[in-house]
Amino acid sequence: MTKRVRLSDSFNPVYPYEDESTSQHPFINPGFISPNGFTQSPDGVLTLKCLTPLTTTGGSLQLKVGGGLTVDDTDGTLQENIGTTTPLVKTGHSIGLSLGAGLGTDENKLCTKLGKGLTFNSNNICIDDNINTLWTGINPTEANCQMMDSSESNDCKLILTLVKTGALVTAFVYVIGVSNNFNMLTTYRNINFTAELFFDSAGNLLTSLSSLKTPLNHKSGQNMATGAITNAKSFMPSTTAYPFNNNSREKENYIYGTCHYTASDHTAFPIDISVMLNQRAIRADTSYCIRITWSWNTGDAPEGQTSATTLVTSPFTFYYIREDD
């Protein structure tokens, strides 16, 4: 027979059954209390068992909330509490990104909008076409220029490259003969031929008026870019530096130089070049013009034979002040 523990004389039989002499609780649960969800802490004091995120700190059952959450003081609802700084924006319960010019979304991904002349290359943005260059291409497959008055069709190739560099344009030009009449010029002692280029106010070549019959375009690799250019004004000779119809400043509109023709016997014949910028317009819709004249006057013709030899001039480079964009 097991002996029962004898309670002290100071034991208080009223819950929580405290022993007044020792202030100890005898770990006695009243019969009407289930331990599920409750605990004694300290002994004899009934409390709730709380697991995170619940807590009774402060005396009442509460919900622990971390950063970004709050409990509404009015209706007690749990709400998000997130602020944003630019360029993030908050609309309702959603966070978005404020997009400026040049940015967009594609398949829910932030992306850069690229305009004409730009492309991606190995995730880097690069210039698709060289918009600082305007040219005929390296060597056109067919004759693109008609210089001789007697010609009824294109008689030579004009290779022209215009490159913007700061306030200047660098021009690179030479000629390759195609027709027999044009190449026969090499058998004359005194000749000249001129390429006239007329442009509208946007810098587009007026092919119906010009010696060059194919439009200029930007450079794309070693080829001409596809599609028409919209504005090439910045490649044009400045009308301030090279005005039209100003006789007092006419000499400022000319550039002079020399290139060569190499004859069949390898003799280099000098060719005089003169470039006239603007100065004279032949029609009201002509806003800019470039005239390039090649000439020679020698004691002997470059080619003594009567059969034509392809007339190829050496390249000539000149510079001029360009028009503003």
From Swiss-Prot:
Annotated keywords: Capsid protein, Host nucleus, Host-virus interaction, Late protein, Viral attachment to host adhesion receptor, Viral attachment to host cell, Virion, Virus entry into host cell
Q: Explain what induces or represses this protein's expression.
A: Expressed in the late phase of the viral replicative cycle.
Q: Which residues cross the membrane?
A: none
Localization (cell): Virion; Host nucleus
Gene Ontology biological-process annotations: adhesion receptor-mediated virion attachment to host cell; cell adhesion; symbiont entry into host cell
The record's Gene Ontology cellular component field reads: host cell nucleus; viral capsid
- Keyword Transferase in the entry? The reply is no
Cited function:
Forms spikes that protrude from each vertex of the icosahedral capsid. Interacts with host receptor CD46 to provide virion initial attachment to target cell. Fiber proteins are shed during virus entry, when virus is still at the cell surface.
Provide the assembly information. Homotrimer. Interacts with host receptor CD46. Interacts (via N-terminal tail region) with pentons.
Please provide the record's free-text comment about the domains of this protein. Answer: The tail region anchors the fiber to penton base capsomers, whereas the shaft, built from several repeated motifs, allows the knob to protrude from the virion.
Q: Which family does it belong to?
A: Belongs to the adenoviridae fiber family.
Q: What else is known?
A: All late proteins expressed from the major late promoter are produced by alternative splicing and alternative polyadenylation of the same gene giving rise to non-overlapping ORFs. A leader sequence is present in the N-terminus of all these mRNAs and is recognized by the viral shutoff protein to provide expression although conventional translation via ribosome scanning from the cap has been shut off in the host cell.
Q: What is this protein called?
A: Fiber protein
Native source species: Human adenovirus B serotype 11 (strain BC34) (HAdV-11)
Please spell out the taxonomic lineage of the organism that makes this protein: Viruses, Varidnaviria, Bamfordvirae, Preplasmiviricota, Tectiliviricetes
